[in-house]
Amino acid sequence: MWLVTFFLLYSLRKAHTEDVGTSLYFVNDSIQQVTFSSTVGVVIPCPAAGSPSAVLRWYLATGDDIYDVPHIRHVHANGTLQLYPFSPSAFNSFIHDNDYFCTAENSAGKIRSPNIRVKAVFREPYTVRVEDQRSMRGNVAVFKCLIPSSVQEYVSVVSWEKDTVSIIPENRFFITSYGGLYISDVQKEDALSTYRCITKHKYSGETRQSNGARLSVSDADPAESIPTMLDSFQSREVRAGRLVELPCIASGYPNPAIRWLKDGRPLPADGRWAKRITGLSIADLRVEDSGTYICEVTNTFGSAEVTGTLTVIDPLRVTLTPKKLKTGIGSTVILSCALSGSPEYVIRWYRNTDLVVVDDFISIRGISNETLLITAAQKSHSGAYQCFATRKSQTAQDFSIITLEDGTPRIVSSFSEKVVNPGEQFSLMCAAKGAPPPTVTWALDDEPIPRDNGHRTNQYTMSDGTTVSHMNVTSPQIKDGGVYRCTARNSVGSAEYQARINVRGPPSIRAMKNITAVAGRDTFINCRVIGYPYYSIKWYKDSLLLPDNHRQVVFENGTLKLMDVQKGMDEGEYLCSVLIQPQLSISQSVHVTVKVPPLIQPFEFPPASIGQLLYIPCVVSSGDMPIHITWRKDGHVILSGSGVTIESKEFMSSLQISSVSLKHNGNYTCIASNAAATVSRERQLIVRVPPRFVVQPNNQDGIYGKAGVLNCSVDGYPPPKVMWKHAKGSGNPQQYHPIPLTGRIQILPNSSLLIRHVLEEDIGYYLCQASNGVGTDISKSMFLTVKIPAMITSHPNTTIAIKGQSKELNCTARGERPIIIRWEKGDTVIDPDRNMRYAIATKDNGDEVISTLKLKPADRGDSVFFSCHAINSYGEDRGLIQLTVQEPPDPPELEIREVKARSMNLRWTQRFDGNSIITGFDIEYKNKSDSWDFKQSTRNISPTINQANIVDLHPASVYSIRMYSFNKIGRSEPSKELTISTEEAAPDGPPMDVTLQPMTSQSIQVTWKAPKKELQNGVIRGYQIGYRENSPGSNGQYSIVEMKATGDSEVYTLDNLKKFAQYGVVVQAFNRAGTGPSSSEINATTLEDVPSQPPENVRAISITSDVAVISWSEPPRSTLNGVLKGYRVIFWSLYMDGEWGEMQNITTTRERVELRGMEKFTNYSVQVLAYTQAGDGVRSSVLYIQTKEDIPGPPAGIKAVPSSASSVVVSWLPPAKPNGIIRKYTIFCSSPGSGQPAPSEYETSPDQLFYRIAHLNRGQQYMLWVAAVTSAGRGNISEKVTIEPAGKAPAKIISFGGTVTTPWMKDVRLPCNSVGEPVPAIKWTKDSEDSAIPVTVDGHRLIQANGTLVLRSVKAEDSGYYTCTATNTWGFDTIIINLLVQVPPDQPRLTVSKTSASSITLAWIPGDNGGSSIRGFVLQYSVDNSEEWKDVFISSSERSFKLESLKCGTWYKVKLAAKNSVGAGRISEIIEAKTHGREPSFSKDQHLFTHINSTHARLNLQGWSSGGCPITAIVLEYRPKGNWGWQSLRTNSSGEVFLTELREATWYELRMKACNSAGCGNESTQFATLDYDGSTIPPIKSAQGEGDDVKKLFTIACPIILATLGVALLFIIRKKRKEKRLKRLRDAKSLAEMLISKNNRSFDTPVKGPPQGPRLHIDIPRVQLLIEDKEGIKQLGDDKATIPVTDTEFSQAVNPQSFCTGVSLHHPALIQNTGPLIDMSDIRPGTNPVSRKSVKSAHSTRNRYSSQWTLTKCQASTPARTLTSDWRTVGSQHGITVTESDSYSASLSQDTDKGRNSMVSTESASSTYEELARAYEHAKLEEQLQHAKFEITECFISDSSSDQMTTGTTDNADSMTSMSTPSEPGICRFTASPPKPQDSERGKSVAVPIPHRASKSDYCNLPLYVKSDAFFRKPDSHEPCPVVPPREASIRSLARGYHPPARHLTLDPAAKPPGLPPPSSSSSSTTLPQRTLPMPTAASTAPAPAPAPAAPAEPPANTTTTTTTHSKVGGSRDSLLEMSTSGAGRAQKQGAGAYSKSYTLV
């Protein structure tokens, strides 16, 4: 129940929540003033708006509507007010200088904006001035920009100039916020400049430049003086939150100190207060900052002070609450207006933009009228209310939307009828809405419900005004049943709802009270029955069953409704009868009485005029008596004394007014009431009033041209109509004529007449006449007199005077006398008594006055605006006269823009043109040493030109130059003389002896000699080599490269050229001045290269089952890169199991080839490439083709077994070569002795591989064979088997054994179908190391009923030999299945073989292929500091790749992963390599500055060296020394750069930054500009200022602090590293102990003698291959990457007598990111994916060409030491082994990057004599190596068991490593580079391992270097090859077999080569020999190890083959650390191998 109630309430809230939301708003109510230029106009958007769209209107502040004035004012449809540009004569103050406001109105109400002051500003001519100032050295100077007061409000200072250069506020120059210029610490040179201010008009945008003012600086030492105020303030008024600057600056000597006081007290400590040289600055002003401020300046000779007042104005803010209100009629509304800000304000209230008038309903309360109260609100009170607060010029407002609606309650949610059990609580909910919120009451059967414990009510009001009431009945009884009614009431009305609630129990009827009904209304009578159930409720009246007429309705719940009750008809007894049983009823009666309500007859008020008698009766025509009649006016009781008399009778009441007046207007209501009801009737009384004058017209004066209002205001009802008439003339009016209303003359809303522009013709009488049809019309006349204000009628706008001559200015005025004429010059009134140069004469001329101003004589200062002002009592007018005084011009300011070798560029600025147009310029120049009599000149230069070039000068010469300017008045004085020096010239001769030599397919070497000495014109700085391709189709444009000069002969190599293309080359020399002529073009052709694109249109067509035709077309000629030699077709087969066949290739010169001998019905991949003399080109995309079908080969195997006495079962294997799709199998059965001529034939489906043949004869032999059938026909038959049926059927397996290969994570089925009688039992076992383990059935393994073993989601550990044994009473049978699980390939070994500026060449060696051919490689690379990797997909045959288009000088990260049919394998270690190049550097030998004058500097940036990478940008920053701010200049050119607008005679700091892709280089220097006269300035002197001590302290303290931090950081780092070393040592010991425990495990064949020691693998960087020098070994303790492990430390952890311990070999320069101490990342999981989970991901290992080395030191004292390059192979039992995980060599990089020890890998890694000699010298320093012998050998073991190893030669070895002839005698060379593209055996040498398809003879064809008597007994020709488990090999056999390439170099200090000690007999057959053995020579006396016993020739089929001695070379499953200690008894898995390189020290 409660849950239901909650959902009802929630739905109610959602359904009735109404958003009152304000639909009116202000876009911007802060607009309160708009000033605009008369020449521009203005557009003012309406600040108010509404949603939905509101009607926008504009009004004047007086409330008058505004109207459109064509071309003057217009209101757009969107509410925008536009004032158009206008001339001064069209100015109208009503339009252009008035207050406006805008309103927005929609259904929500109407709001108005604050008043907006709109003011137009005229474009007045004005001048700004700066006066000359005086100051002492070291003091302060203040310049002020003097702006005329008439425009001061609109004009502001925007900048200052010093000698036409804008002043940047810094150092000694400061610009105040109000436009003053302060110069502190005045220097002598400050007097050499002129200072100007620049102003800007805020509204017109017009700028003005002042005159140039000068500063006079006293030459003498400063004189002692008291302080004098230079700038101060008096009062400021600023808004809060802004910044203010109070100026206070004074001069004096000594410099005065400044102290500030506020209200007589020192300034408080506040960060907002800042004392500056310009004064006191206060930020974020607050009201409390207001006060009186005193600035005191004091020195030793006196003091001065200035006092000013600061007033902070807090802006007014108004908040009106509530913002929106929706309530009901009759409620009370309270609006509160809260203000913040200034306390002085006035509040006004508006409703819908009208001022609120206080009446009976509305009152305004509060001290400041801040509260508006509305009582008994009516519908008319709805609307928008605004609270306006005004203080002086500030106005703020806020508004609220009030919505009043009919508040009569209504039920919005209720309950329904229900039946409840006694004691079962229930709750009833009733929700009502109204305004004000109603109150809900409850009744049961028309009686109030008592409040007790059983009945509880709960009522609350929701946020939307809904009242919710609950009636909760906790334990209902029968009496609680009945009709429940909820009634909602408020002051407006009521509403109710009822429904029956039945409580189960015996029915009964409550006593019913008599009912009084109102006639004409509906009445409900409830039958107050309680209890439930009952059958029916019926009503009777006068024994008649109701209803008996249409006005009666009986509802199902027993309620009787009487509609339109009638007296008499509906009165009487009503009986309610309730049928409670079929024959039993109960009843109760009720009496109904009908009362008739009053009925008022209609009445109306007749039209009434003031003073009339009025009588209105109110008659009640019907209704039960008694009836009470009353009257009300406007809802209030009519009081006595109001002039209204009321007379009442029994059924009538009359209202009588003896004399009607205006106060009687209103709504009158007659109310009649009796016992039945109260009724009323309302009518309105309107009193008509004749017109009367409120304001009578009176005679008045109008001013010509101004607006005039003729006042006339009338009142009356209906509102009177006013008409204005006019009678011209000043005499008695004869006749009045109606005045036509125009745009100039209009009638205002108050009836007054508005004349917008009063004219003289408006003189006359005006009549105001009003009428409204009541009484007689009224009228009143008045006389208008027009007064003429003073007006200027004539004056010249502009005039010209000549300097030194007299000039007269005339001005004529008219208007009402007297007229006064005043002359002003600028803003100053001219007084001839004080200034004798001026004279004023005035005379009358009729109705005009003429005034003349005479200047005697005119000078330059008179070039201003003169104004004559005419003034009388009615106005003032002004005439502006611009006087221009002309004179000869000032000399121009000349500057040298650019000086070249043979020319110079001049620029000049004309300072003052003499107020006459400049007509030309003259330039004169001469040699510095000559007099001006020998000058050269250029005359009459056009005045429109401000710069010129002087040519034909001599390089490196000194010239003097000056200028004149002239106008029509005369010629100026000469300008200041400048001195310049010309520069060097570019070379005039080309380089000599240019030759070209092609170097590669993309490079040409260019050689040449310098130009002749006499043509160099300076020092040759470098050369530009231009080259272009001369082949057809090239654009013929030269590409330019640049290099520095190195001597008389030069060499340069052009790279990145097109291959096999002809190029033309030219060379040019350049010096500082430029580039000389180029040499003659010489041509050369680049060398050939391989084709860069494959052949096109490659097609393949299958001709027969073993023949296919491949065709193609020639690649594009442009991609051949040479002479095409032929084509090579590469193809390989794709087997059904997903593996690839052997790759083959065919070479041809034709464009078609026929491939024969292909496998039948086989998919082939085909690629075609073209080759040139340079090698093979790019292969084409792989093309797939399938050969056609042929007849199949014989089935691969056949079995036949007896299944009963008369039947046999034959099974077979599919053909090894099906040559097509097998359609069926045919089984042949023949009996040789039966005499049947033909065998019987049986056919089966292709998916059935066995068949039962029945009905055979017992004891008779039968011969069986099988043939497969394809679409090509029947194939070859299988081997024939003989069988005879037998009664006893022993267990036989008809399935076949063999090898099953599958990818991991797949389900595999191993079949073992058997026959026999009885049915055989099946048992599966799996071979382990020492026994066969039964296969258990679990979730992973399942044995089906037919004997099939199902392995689900196979893993690598599921690989192995599975044996199925079938057994019954008569025998058993066994098959063996070898399961090989393919896994993703192992990680490749990635190395860097070569780098260049834009490329990195990578090489790699693939890892274990996981049992599946490698399909390709994925190479990823990224920039070192980026994690965005790019992918490159590479063919599986590639072993190297060149990354091109890389950034120069950039580190790159590279990683590689291989992919096979299973998926992608482990990612290689991330290696890093850097392309060639470095950041730019600046050569100290280069001259940076080529020219410096007083304002410019020219820089030569050719001194920047690119570092091998092109420079992308050069940034120059410079500043005057001592300044903080830098000016910057950016360029991409390395040529010349100009620094302009420098200060003269100033030292500058310059810093440069040049950047390329490798980084940025920096360079800094200083330079000084020249003085204004061209002289140099002295060096910088160290002058200690205020901040010097702080700077020195900072300079000293910083290094100390940094050093202290560095020491502390070093201490922490060393402590951390020490902890890491200890942890690594513990890890090393733990690993050693673990290896000991593994080593102590027992095997099948225990090793005799001491076990081999564990090998500790420690990750350190790759360094030199041989031995560290003594100094390096001593530094092991300082290694920061790997802890040194000593013999003593290892002896504590392990038994020194039982195995060897590991010692790390270090290099002092180590990188720190080479991995942890024990790095297991190189442990190859082989085919075991589980083991990979414990190995770190390759992504976590990042090596900068680092390698892992392990030094295993045996405790046994032997002189032999072996350095092996692969720690995964078995090490020697005697000696120290250093292992290397990478297969390439490296040396320390020459790169100097910090933190990077990168290694440069070469394509071939070999040791030279020099390296061995150095190692020999190092060995002599070590006591342990005094008698050392160096042996260097190499050994290779294939990592594949492919068919390539069956050839018996090394030619087909895996191409990842190739053996080559040593480059030097005695040194075995190792090459890690991939095969070259043109290698003829490339197809054979590609490392694509083929899955093993072994037969017995596979191991007979192993290469010589794999065979060994120790493992295999040589088979005789008649003896089969011994069966050996696959993937087993002997280290000894490898060493023995691979002896031909082995070489030795013996370096013995004693010249006595010791041999190897002979092994003991006890260990000769069990101890593994050294990994590499030297060739038997005279120098080697060590005997060969004794051979091990031979293996048995033919082990039994059901036993495991073992060997006496063998070693695991490269396990694919077990740990490699385990492998090194495995000893004998471990079976080597197929395909394992090792690649290694070793160096042996004996």
UniProtKB/Swiss-Prot annotation:
InterPro entries in alphabetical order: DSCAM/DSCAML_C, FN3_dom, FN3_sf, Ig-like_dom, Ig-like_dom_sf, Ig-like_fold, Ig_I-set, Ig_sub
Domain Fibronectin type-III positions: 888-985, 990-1089, 1094-1190, 1194-1289, 1384-1478, 1479-1579
Gene Ontology cellular component terms for the protein in this record: plasma membrane; synapse
Residue stretches of biased makeup (Pro residues): 1951-1960, 1984-1995
CDD domains with a match to the protein in the record: FN3, Ig, Ig_DSCAM, IgI_5_Dscam
Record GO biological process: camera-type eye photoreceptor cell differentiation; homophilic cell adhesion via plasma membrane adhesion molecules; retina layer formation; synapse assembly
Spans within the Extracellular topological domain: 18-1592
Membrane-spanning segments: 1593-1613
Span list, region Disordered: 1716-1742, 1781-1805, 1841-1865, 1940-2042
Glycosylation sites: 28, 78, 369, 472, 514, 557, 667, 711, 750, 797, 810, 927, 1083, 1145, 1163, 1276, 1346, 1493, 1532, 1562
PROSITE patterns: FN3 (PS50853), IG_LIKE (PS50835)
Polar residues: compositionally biased ranges: 1781-1790, 1841-1863
Tissue and organ distribution: SDK1, SDK2, DSCAM and DSCAML1 are expressed in non-overlapping subsets of interneurons and retinal ganglion cells (RGCs) that form synapses in distinct inner plexiform layer (IPL) sublaminae.
This protein's UniProt keywords: Cell adhesion, Cell membrane, Disulfide bond, Glycoprotein, Immunoglobulin domain, Membrane, Neurogenesis, Repeat, Signal, Synapse, Transmembrane, Transmembrane helix
Ig-like C2-type domain: residues covered: 37-107, 114-216, 227-311, 315-403, 409-502, 507-587, 597-686, 691-785, 789-886, 1279-1368
Record's subcellular location: Cell membrane; Synapse
Disulfide bridge positions per record: C46-C102, C145-C197, C248-C295, C337-C387, C430-C486, C527-C576, C618-C670, C712-C768, C811-C868, C1312-C1364
Signal peptide per UniProt: 1-17
Function: Cell adhesion molecule that plays a role in neuronal self-avoidance. Promotes repulsion between specific neuronal processes of either the same cell or the same subtype of cells. Adhesion molecule that promotes lamina-specific synaptic connections in the retina: expressed in specific subsets of interneurons and retinal ganglion cells (RGCs) and promotes synaptic connectivity via homophilic interactions.
Subunit and interaction comment: Homodimer; mediates homophilic interactions to promote cell adhesion.
Record's protein name: Cell adhesion molecule DSCAML1
Lineage: Eukaryota, Metazoa, Chordata, Craniata, Vertebrata
